[in-house]
Amino acid sequence: MTTTIFEPGGFRYMPAVSQYSGGVAAQPGLRIERARFSRVVPLAEGFERIAQHLASLGRPNSAFCACELRSPAPFTEEGFRAFNAIYITTLERWGLMQGGVNPVARSNVCPDIDPPAQPGFHAFSYTVVDAAAAPYFIVAGSAESPEGKGDYRDNAIAFGDVSPAGLRRKAQFVLAEMERRMQALGFDWSSTTATQVYSVHDIHPFLADELVRRGAMRHGLSWHYNRPPIQHLEYEMDCRGVSTEIVLPG
């Protein structure tokens, strides 16, 4: 899998589906920073806050390269498509979409307890100029269903099976997808600074064998008691390698 350079933003990306890319990496002379809101900020307000933050750094909106969303509950397939259509309108207005191809990486998950009232931003990432920067990257979220093959439900790994064996199969698929995306960007687990898991199920039975032994937890693990964004999916991950992370007021 090859990557494509998005010159206006100073990053390259792994093409995936219309709603997001498979991952991004900073171009030479730039680095990726991650900013997390102290609480979820609703989508429209969040885009405004992101634009203000980028402007304060002297960066264009096109420097926006990744985000982590939170939604009230898992979507139906049709509901997910409708949400994505709303989400990408701002990306189109910002000049981020290239012929229908989306360069921005994204995770979108649903807190099972105390969810937000509406979809919004948990965190976002962007490029900044840094002549001495080491390579930095972000891999988009993936659940246990291949992208671009029709309905997620119809292609889900071990559909409906939340037994230890079923969850292990789901995790194996997602971990392999993380590795495939990192490899396309020129990275591996040794390059990560953070790994995140989103599931409401017990991951301990396969944690050591599937995550620790392959190096996915070299800096520990952030486990969010969240569900993937589509109904009937059970396990999602993303990962990143960045040097600067900040927290902004919600």
Can you say where each PLM-predicted feature lies in the sequence?
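Intrinsically disordered, low-complexity acidic/Q/S/K-rich activation/interaction tracts characteristic
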Residues: M1, S18-A25, R39-A44, I50-R59
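Extended repeat-based interaction scaffolds and adjacent low-complexity, acidic/S/T/P-biased segments
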Residues: T2-F6, Y13-Y20, R34, S38-V40, ...
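Short, well-ordered alpha-helical segments
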Residues: G46-L54, G58-S62, C67-S71, T76-I86, ...
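Hydrophobic alpha-helical segments and helix pairs
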Residues: P72-P115
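Short glycine/threonine-rich loop-to-helix capping motif typified by GTGT followed
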Residues: P74-F83, Y198-R213
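C-terminal edge-of-domain segments
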Residues: T90, S107-A132, R218-G250
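RNase H-like nuclease fold core
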Residues: Y126-S163
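Beta-strand segments within the central parallel beta-sheet cores of soluble alpha/beta enzyme folds
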Residues: S190-Y198
